[in-house]
């Protein structure tokens, strides 16, 4: 294994932020092309990294400077905006800033405001984004929106003269630096010579690499090793809570009946009704006590009036009449949709063609190659394998891969990595710490596994996903009585390894929560990367990719999102 490859995976970032205890402006690298527009020239901002994350705060600072603005400390004369995390409140912000009150003319605004400004390339209204003191008296003058002078209509994007005259204006954030012989490097381009510039290079051991793979990090001295509590500001975000602290379901007698209906709607293709039931079921499972009245049911977010009526019917009669009227098609549709490669629409088509059993499908239906394989191994695919069998499958792939290159990393993800006792399938992620040697391994590895008789059927022989390559197939361990199992092999570049590891570990519910949280912060999370300053249109559709943030480990992803780190076993939602 190339040790330099490992070192590059844990870069030492150069900080570009102001000392919060100083009135001096931040020292910012040489401006990049694009300042000329200067549409942020009237902005003098301090970015408070708490909750936002240091890397994202640095990115905001860089964007402000690039577009003509200035970055100040919170105490600097003339500061106009102090930008804080979405979950921050006014009083806590002042405590962290060590200020008795906001500086004259300054506004406390949420980071979403700055993200919106960067997306629209103009200073936008701060209405709905600004934080004010709950103790503010009614006769105290209110700051004008987005720093505009209310007496001067038509001056959108220009800060009021009165605000700027309260104190001496800030000096320019940077003075023109001497000409460099080479263009300045961006944060993601810092090389090993930059890392060693302070005389101390990062020391990354094999234990660090093992921690990255397993997701288990050593507990610092003095800590009890239990899961960190979720920050209060993150509320009920699933990704902020350890799954080990799932609430007791006090309404099991209700949710188990609603789940039957939800499943019926799902196999019938009524996805919106199925989604509505799923939300109500999750809300009832999380409720802190048994539901006892119609009013109480209606008060639970996610449970509407009609759902509350069904809850009361179950409470009063112990039954739900709607279950008596589930179509006879539902069990047949469920049977068909469990064939790998057949979704709800295909299952419905087969039902309407008059098929009622797997024998009908086997003898009469027109099947794709994938559906034929799914039907052939129907019972094996539905049977969950013991954890020990999944470990043997991972080992088989690892030994074969490392026969080509001993430095390759192979990690089983999914329910196996989350510590489940049984697994439905196995996802094996493959990479190499040097960032290069994973290339060219995909096809030779699959050929080797086929020659050994380990891979028995190919479902999708190669699926390209950016720089990632994915194989979906069927395997069987050597020996009598072994069953056919679903296996996915994904080869990824090391720069995407942490985000891919997070994505393929799951759970799906946990991943959806993390992606949704990232979206609220103007970011985007995928199996490839975590990006900041993402541009979305009014429908929330991403139209600008933003800037990829460095994420050498899963821990970095959590940190950049302002989340406490959750080990894989704590993500089993």
From Swiss-Prot:
Signal sequence, start to end: none
GO molecular function: 5'-deoxyribose-5-phosphate lyase activity; DNA binding; DNA-directed DNA polymerase activity; metal ion binding
Name listed for the protein in its UniProt record: DNA polymerase lambda
Keyword Protease part of the UniProt annotation: no
PANTHER family hit by this protein: DNA POLYMERASE LAMBDA, DNA POLYMERASE TYPE-X FAMILY MEMBER
UniProt xrefs under Gene3D superfamilies: 5' to 3' exonuclease, C-terminal subdomain, Beta Polymerase, domain 2, BRCT domain, DNA polymerase beta, N-terminal domain-like, DNA polymerase, thumb domain
BRCT domain ranges (all copies): 35-131
InterPro entries with a match to the protein in the record: BRCT_dom, BRCT_dom_sf, DNA-dir_DNA_pol_X, DNA_pol-X_BS, DNA_pol_b-like_N, DNA_pol_B_palm_palm, DNA_pol_lambd_fingers_domain, DNA_pol_lamdba_lyase_dom_sf
Comp. bias (Polar residues): 127-149
Quaternary structure and interacting proteins, as annotated: Interacts with PCNA. Interacts with PAXX; promoting POLL recruitment to double-strand breaks (DSBs) and stimulation of the end-filling activity of POLL. Interacts with XRCC4; promoting POLL recruitment to double-strand breaks (DSBs) and stimulation of the end-filling activity of POLL. Interacts with NHEJ1/XLF; promoting POLL recruitment to double-strand breaks (DSBs) and stimulation of the end-filling activity of POLL.
Region described as DNA-binding: spans on this chain: 263-277, 343-346, 464-503
GO BP: any one term: DNA biosynthetic process
Domain of life: Eukaryota
Residue numbers binding dCTP: 384, 415-418, 424-427, 511
Residue ranges of the region described as Involved in primer binding: 418-427
Species this chain originates from: Rattus norvegicus (Rat)
EC number: 2.7.7.7, 4.2.99.-
The gene coding this protein: Poll
